[in-house]
From Swiss-Prot:
Belongs to the UvrC family. The lineage of its organism: Bacteria, Bacillati, Bacillota, Bacilli, Bacillales. PROSITE patterns: GIY_YIG, UVR, UVRC. It comes from Staphylococcus epidermidis (strain ATCC 12228 / FDA PCI 1200). Residues 17-94 form the GIY-YIG domain. GO terms for cellular component: cytoplasm; excinuclease repair complex. This is UvrABC system protein C.
Length: 594
C-alpha cells in the first residue's frame, strides 16, 4: 500500500457522520472533484472500497488527498457544492460546472408576475430562489406555492378566463383588474417562505385545514395537512446562502488541548465561495489569540477587507474594530448566527480530527516498535539511530544519522558527518569511522545510547559496525541492516551475527516504520551531500589541468578511486585510463607538484 493510501485510510476513520461537501485532490494538490453527502464518512469510504464505473475508477486513481466541510443539512451541502464547483472548476464535475444544470424557482418581473421553474438565470428579469437538487424538488415546491398563491399561469394574456381561475390558482388579470399590492404581498410571503421563514404560510394552511375540517371536508383537510407536512420537510434554513449580496467574512473558532482552529467562511453575492482553516498553538488566552490572528489575517496575509466581518458574540467588538477597518457584526439570532455556529462547528471537527489522527499515529508507532522488538527478540527499541553514507565515486563523502524516539523522528538529535579518514568510495570504512566518532562522543558526554542501531546496507556494513562497538568501544547494542531491492525500495531487515532475515510482513506497522526510517536517513544524507557539493563545487586539482573536463574527471575518479591513487599511478596506467599522451603528462606533472 502506498503512503498516500495509508494517510487517506487514516483520515477516513475520523471523518464525521454528518452532511457536508468534500474536495478530492490530486498529486499536485489540485481539486479534481467536489461532491456532497448526507453522511460524509460513508460517502468518502465508498470511493475507496468496491467496484466502480470507468469514470469513477479514473477519478479514484488520481486521488491523493481530500478535504471536507461540514454543513447543517443536505440542502446546504448542495448550495456549498455549487459554490465550490464554481470556484475550482474541477475537471471531474463536468455536469456541475454551470448553474443551468440545476433548477431555480423564479417570480417574473412583470406587471402580472408568474411563478416558474427555470434552469436559466438572467439578471434583472425577476427574483430567483434555489438552486434545487433536482427538477422534481423544484416542481413540487412550485406546485405547493401555486395552490396557495394565485399568480398568473399563462405565458401570454388570454382573452377569457382559464381553468386556473376557476380552481382558485389565478386572479384572472386577463379579465379583471388586480390590485398590484396583492402581488407584492404574495411575493414577500413567498420570499420569506423560500428563505426559511415559514410561519406565515403555515398559518394560512392551518386556517384552511381547520375550516375544511369544520365543514366536514376531510379530504380537503387531509390535503392541507399533507401540504403542511411537505413544508416541514422542505424548509430547512439554508445558512450557506444569504438573502442579501453583502460581501462578508464569517469567523468561528474552537479551542482544545492547547490548540486553536480558526475557520473563515468567505461569503460573496450571498454564497459561501471558500473557507480558510488555520491551526494555531495557544500562547495566550483564546480571545487574545483570536485578536492577534484576525489582525494579521487582513494585513500580513493581504486578504481583502469585506463590507462586514462577522465574529462570535463572546469577543470584544471594540478590540477587533481597532485592528480591522470595516463593519464588525456579532449576530445573536437567525441565519447569520447559524453561520457563526457552523464555522465554530467546523473548527471543532477539524481539531477533533487533528487529535484523533495524532492519537492513531502514536498508537500505530508504539505498536510498530513493539512488534519490531518482538520479531528481533530484543527489548522494545524506544530509541533508534540509523546511518547512511553518500558520495559520488568517493568525492566529498559524507554520512548522516537520524534518530527516532517512540517511532517518530527526533530531529534535534540528527547528525551530519564529513568523512575524514577514508579515501575513495569505501562504504564499509566510512561507516566504521562515523560509528566510532558518534559513540565515542556519546560515551564521553554521557549522552543516551540507542536501543537499536540500523545501517543502510547488508552483512558487511553490520559486521564493521559491530566490530567497532564491541571491540573498540565495549558497547553491546543491537545492530540491524536494511537492504533495498532493485527498485531501490526497502526490501528486508537483517539481524544477528549471520545477518539473517527478520520475518516481517510487508504490510505490518513495523515494516512501514523501517521504510520511513530508511527513507528519512537517505533523504538526510543525500541533502547533506548535495549541500557539500554545492559548497566545494567538486573543486579539485583536476579542475586546473588542461584537457580534463567533467567527463574525464568523473572517469578518472571511477577508475582510480581517489587523487592519491592517481598520483601513485604510472604514465602508462594513466594512458590506459583513456587519456591522450599530452593530457596524461599534464596530469602527472600537476599531481607530482601537488
Amino acid at each position: 500500500m502506498e503512503e498516500y493510501q495509508k494517510k487517506i485510510k487514516e483520515k477516513l476513520n475520523v471523518v464525521p457522520l454528518e452532511p457536508g461537501c468534500y474536495l478530492m485532490k490530486d498529486r499536485n494538490d489540485q481539486v479534481i472533484y467536489v461532491g456532497k453527502a448526507k453522511r460524509l464518512r460513508n460517502r468518502l469510504r465508498s470511493y475507496f472500497t468496491g467496484a466502480h464505473d470507468a469514470k469513477t475508477t479514473r477519478l479514484v486513481g488520481e486521488i491523493r488527498n481530500f478535504e471536507f466541510i461540514v454543513t447543517s443539512s443536505e440542502t446546504e451541502s448542495l448550495l456549498l457544492e455549487l459554490n465550490l464547483i464554481k470556484q475550482y472548476q474541477p475537471r471531474y464535475n463536468i455536469l456541475l460546472k454551470d448553474d443551468k444544470s440545476y433548477p431555480f424557482i423564479k417570480i417574473t418581473k412583470e406587471k402580472h408576475p408568474r411563478l416558474l421553474v427555470t434552469r436559466t438565470v438572467k439578471k434583472n428579469s425577476g427574483k430567483y430562489f434555489g438552486p434545487y437538487p433536482n427538477a422534481y424538488s423544484a416542481q413540487e415546491t412550485k406546485k405547493l406555492l401555486d395552490r396557495i398563491y394565485p399568480f398568473r399561469k399563462c405565458d401570454n394574456m388570454p382573452d377569457k378566463l382559464c381553468l386556473y381561475y376557476h380552481i382558485g390558482q389565478c386572479m384572472g388579470p386577463c379579465v379583471y383588474d388586480v390590485d398590484l399590492e396583492k402581488y407584492a404581498q404574495m411575493t414577500k410571503e413567498i420570499t420569506d417562505f423560500l428563505n426559511g421563514e415559514d410561519k406565515t404560510i403555515l398559518h394560512h394552511l392551518e386556517d384552511r385545514m381547520n375550516k375544511a375540517s369544520e365543514q366536514l371536508d376531510f379530504e380537503q383537510a387531509k390535503e392541507y395537512r399533507d401540504m403542511i407536512q411537505h413544508i416541514h420537510n422542505l424548509t430547512k434554513k439554508q445558512k450557506i446562502m444569504s438573502s442579501d449580496n453583502t460581501i462578508r467574512d464569517v469567523f468561528g473558532y474552537s479551542v482544545s488541548k492547547g490548540w486553536m482552529c480558526v475557520q473563515v467562511f468567505f461569503v460573496r453575492q450571498g454564497n459561501m465561495i471558500k473557507r480558510d482553516a488555520t491551526m494555531i498553538p495557544l500562547q495566550q488566552t483564546e480571545e487574545e489569540e483570536f485578536y492577534t490572528f484576525i489582525g494579521q489575517f487582513y494585513s500580513l496575509n493581504q486578504h481583502l477587507l469585506p463590507k462586514e466581518v462577522h465574529v462570535p458574540k463572546n469577543l470584544d467588538k471594540d478590540i477587533i474594530q481597532s485592528v480591522v477597518d470595516t463593519k464588525i457584526v456579532q449576530p445573536v439570532r437567525g441565519a447569520k448566527k447559524d453561520m457563526i455556529n457552523l464555522a465554530n462547528h467546523n473548527a471543532e471537527v477539524q481539531l477533533d480530527n487533528k487529535f484523533e489522527l495524532i492519537a492513531r499515529d502514536e498508537s500505530r508507532t508504539i505498536k510498530a516498535i513493539e512488534e519490531l522488538g518482538e520479531r528481533m527478540g530484543i527489548q522494545t527499541p524506544i530509541r533508534i539511530e540509523a546511518f547512511d553514507n553518500s558520495n559520488i565515486q568517493g568525492v566529498d563523502p559524507v554520512s548522516a544519522m537520524v534518530t527516532f524516539v517512540d517511532g517518530k523522528p527526533h530531529k534535534k538529535d540528527y547528525r551530519k558527518y564529513k568523512i575524514k579518514t577514508v579515501e575513495g568510495p569505501d562504504d564499509y570504512k566510512s561507516m566504521r569511522e562515523v560509528v566510532r566518532r558518534r559513540y565515542t562522543r556519546v560515551l564521553n558526554e554521557g549522552l543516551p545510547l540507542p536501543d537499536l542501531i540500523i545501517v543502510d546496507g547488508g552483512k558487511g556494513h553490520m559486521n564493521g559496525v559491530m566490530d567497532v562497538l564491541e571491540n573498540e568501544l565495549g558497547l553491546d547494542i543491537p545492530v540491524a541492516g536494511l537492504q533495498k531491492n532493485d527498485k531501490h525500495q526497502t526490501s528486508e531487515l537483517l539481524y544477528g551475527a549471520s545477518a539473517e532475515i527478520v520475518p516481517l510482513k510487508k504490510n505490518s506497522q513495523a515494516f512501514y516504520l523501517l521504510h520511513r526510517i530508511q527513507d528519512e536517513v537517505h533523504r538526510f544524507a543525500i541533502t547533506f551531500h548535495r549541500q557539500t557539493r554545492q559548497k566545494t563545487g567538486l573543486k579539485s586539482v583536476l579542475d586546473d589541468i588542461d584537457g580534463i573536463g567533467t567527463k574525464r574527471k568523473t572517469s578518472l575518479l571511477r577508475t582510480f578511486g581517489s587523487i592519491k591513487k592517481m598520483k601513485e599511478a604510472s604514465f602508462d596506467e594513466l594512458r590506459q585510463a583513456g587519456l591522450p599522451e599530452k593530457v596524461a603528462k599534464n596530469l602527472q606533472n600537476a599531481l607530482q607538484n601537488k
